[in-house]
């Protein structure tokens, strides 16, 4: 049993570290599908964007030419500014936005690409300063 678990761990580790990473400047778009350069197969892997100084500004996972997985945006100081999850180019789950200090600024729940649930905004001390409820992208009164 130990040997099987070790083999599975090694295979999953190799696969996890072999994900292809490209810069956003290498991408081309055809019918809303992402490709790298003139490749014929839709891109699967990680896309990174950098500013003119070479600082990472964004990172997103793609599968079959569509955003699929984690998407992160960074402040110029390198700290995380926002994180969201996508499935086949559709935003799902809770988007989290952060102050430059790293503290949570907002949480916005998404379902099928639309805000759905209670969105919350926080001050820098972590206190909820606003709450708004949405259903299928529409504010609930």
Predicted regions and their residues:
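Sec-dependent N-terminal signal peptides
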Residues: 4-13
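Glycine/tyrosine- and acidic-biased, solvent-exposed loop/turn segments at the edges of beta-strands
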Residues: 14-141
């Amino acid at each position: 049993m130990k040997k099987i678990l070790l083999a599975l761990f090694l295979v999953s580790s190799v696969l996890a570290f072999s994900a292809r990473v490209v810069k956003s400047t290498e991408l081309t778009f055809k019918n809303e599908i992402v490709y790298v350069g003139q490749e014929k197969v839709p891109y699967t892997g990680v896309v990174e964007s950098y500013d003119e100084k070479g600082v990472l500004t964004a990172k997103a996972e793609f599968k079959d030419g569509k955003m699929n997985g984690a998407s992160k945006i960074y402040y110029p100081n390198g700290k995380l500014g926002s994180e969201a999850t996508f499935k086949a180019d559709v935003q799902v789950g809770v988007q989290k936005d952060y102050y430059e200090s790293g503290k949570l600024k907002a949480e916005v729940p998404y379902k099928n690409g639309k805000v759905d649930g209670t969105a919350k905004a926080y001050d820098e001390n972590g206190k909820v300063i606003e709450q708004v409820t949405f259903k299928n992208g529409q504010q609930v009164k």
